[in-house]
Amino acid sequence: MNEKEIKQVFSDVQQRLDTLQGSDASFMFIGHQGNHFVISGKTNEISSQILFAMMRYPVIRDIIKECATRYDGLNAQYGSNVRNVKMDHLIEQNSGNEN
């Protein structure tokens, strides 16, 4: 995967999040270790919205999971608005709660 293709995946995810949460739901997928995913919103509130979107909408969770699988090794350090997300926990939270 080259940089252009990676940016396209991020753009696709961003568009879906914008549709779900409004234009302020900006995020960056930073990387993952095992099944822990690191995402960052512009603010803590937006990061929380992203986590909500991941739990509520399986398509968002699946896209972010795919990003993590395809782009292993992406890594960075950010401030307090970074969230570590354990995918097993999200799947467990979401199972049986689809309406």
Residue ranges, per PLM feature:
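Solvent-exposed interaction surfaces and binding hotspots enriched for charged
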Residues: 1-99
